[in-house]
Amino acid sequence: MSVPVQHPMYIDGQFVTWRGDAWIDVVNPATEAVISRIPDGQAEDARKAIDAAERAQPEWEALPAIERASWLRKISAGIRERASEISALIVEEGGKIQQLAEVEVAFTADYIDYMAEWARRYEGEIIQSDRPGENILLFKRALGVTTGILPWNFPFFLIARKMAPALLTGNTIVIKPSEFTPNNAIAFAKIVDEIGLPRGVFNLVLGRGETVGQELAGNPKVAMVSMTGSVSAGEKIMATAAKNITKVCLELGGKAPAIVMDDADLELAVKAIVDSRVINSGQVCNCAERVYVQKGIYDQFVNRLGEAMQAVQFGNPAERNDIAMGPLINAAALERVEQKVARAVEEGARVAFGGKAVEGKGYYYPPTLLLDVRQEMSIMHEETFGPVLPVVAFDTLEDAISMANDSDYGLTSSIYTQNLNVAMKAIKGLKFGETYINRENFEAMQGFHAGWRKSGIGGADGKHGLHEYLQTQVVYLQS
């Protein structure tokens, strides 16, 4: 039996062999086989990476933005050259279907190129002064050392979402991938190394959140920590960062409502909602997690929704190309989804189909539809993060908006209607960072991905995401 490959970290421009004894197994969720091992890194490793980033930052910031952008384009070119290799890694370690892995890799390269285009576009200001002969200048300056703590559901793209705006604006960065999906990050570091990016500008530290992650949030040399993950993890990062008043950018959980009005295009609504729920086996924070259907079309919609959900094929993505879903990420995730559904049934919900984990190897949970659901049930409030759709009927738009807003989360929402007035009322009434009208829940790189309430602080993408990595310096110049 072959020994799984043991990965190094990438610190200060070189791959660093782990000298410790503790390793973390990386498991293929489709087969439960160990596919690699990574160092169980410690705070000391994170400190070394932060120190390297601090040393590199002044010289990196001194480069013209257009030169920093040229380095980003070299990275994106390297990604495209290795696209097949990287997508295979994502399939293997994350259980993602092949088509989605390929999209993630291509989108990552495009995203880096998009951010590089901002090199000539982000600007300061000249402000009118009240004093004769004075000029007030507002400069946009880099923060310094930034850190990025990644999730496992879109692990490769999240490297770019944090790294690209950070580097373009003159910051350096230390990245910690999830211990469940680190192999693609190693491939990213190899590209960075091969293109010769200046030492210390990009660093990769491996390990767990409670050790490496806490140091990345709590080290006083860090100017900002950007973290994507659960609310509980975000709370810990925020508390640790608060000790140094370190800026945080947090993208956390979601419980996205989808509202279907009685005038909706049902074929479109069913397809968009099913696509939003089964993508990545339901493990996407911004996709529909609860559905509100107007009573006049409830039976018709539920029948169509059930047919579409039952038609979803799932299996091992390394073996099948005709599937829409792979497994959940690990045994703990599978158990959580099982518990959420079991509790819903205890509270009175009815499982129309699905509802039980698949026996055998792999962490598979089938598409599941829950009916006879009431708003007060836990399944309508707690993030499921699996291919489960609970459906509730409503009378009026006001009722639907009220139930949609009855949530600790505020990331995304959606509504399906052919009435522009209804859509506009929903837009004004829904208290979410994003609202989708007659389409699936998936953001654009030039938009702004930001949640309200417990879904996060700050945001990513577009002009506003770029500015998360900048701070202002105002100069009063008297002549």
Curated annotation (Swiss-Prot):
Its EC number is 1.2.1.22, 1.2.1.21. Pfam families: Aldedh. Coiled coil: none annotated. Substrate inhibition is very strong with lactaldehyde, diminishing progressively with glycolaldehyde, glyceraldehyde or methylglyoxal. Inhibited by p-hydroxy mercuribenzoate and by some cations, including Mn(2+), Ca(2+), Cu(2+) and Zn(2+). Inhibited by NADH. Optimum pH is 10. GO terms for molecular function: glycolaldehyde dehydrogenase (NAD+) activity; identical protein binding; lactaldehyde dehydrogenase (NAD+) activity; succinate-semialdehyde dehydrogenase (NAD+) activity. The record marks 286 as: Important for substrate specificity. InterPro entries: Ald_DH/histidinol_DH, Ald_DH_C, Ald_DH_CS_CYS, Ald_DH_CS_GLU, Ald_DH_N, Aldehyde_DH_dom, Aldehyde_DH_Superfamily. GO terms for cellular component: cytosol; protein-containing complex. Induction: Induced, under aerobic conditions, by at least three different types of molecules, the sugars fucose and rhamnose, the diol ethylene glycol and the amino acid glutamate. Changing residue 180 to T: Can bind and use NADP(+) as coenzyme. 16-fold increase in catalytic efficiency with NAD(+) as coenzyme. Pathway: Carbohydrate degradation; L-fucose degradation; Carbohydrate degradation; L-rhamnose degradation. It comes from the Bacteria. Keywords: NAD, Oxidoreductase. One of its GO terms (biological process) is gamma-aminobutyric acid catabolic process. Catalyzes the irreversible oxidation of L-lactaldehyde to L-lactate. Also shows high activity with glycolaldehyde and L-glyceraldehyde. Has weaker activity with various aldehydes such as methylglyoxal, propionaldehyde or benzaldehyde. Involved in the degradation of lactaldehyde produced during metabolism of L-fucose and L-rhamnose. It may be involved in several other metabolic pathways. Belongs to the aldehyde dehydrogenase family. Homotetramer. This is Lactaldehyde dehydrogenase. It comes from Escherichia coli (strain K12).
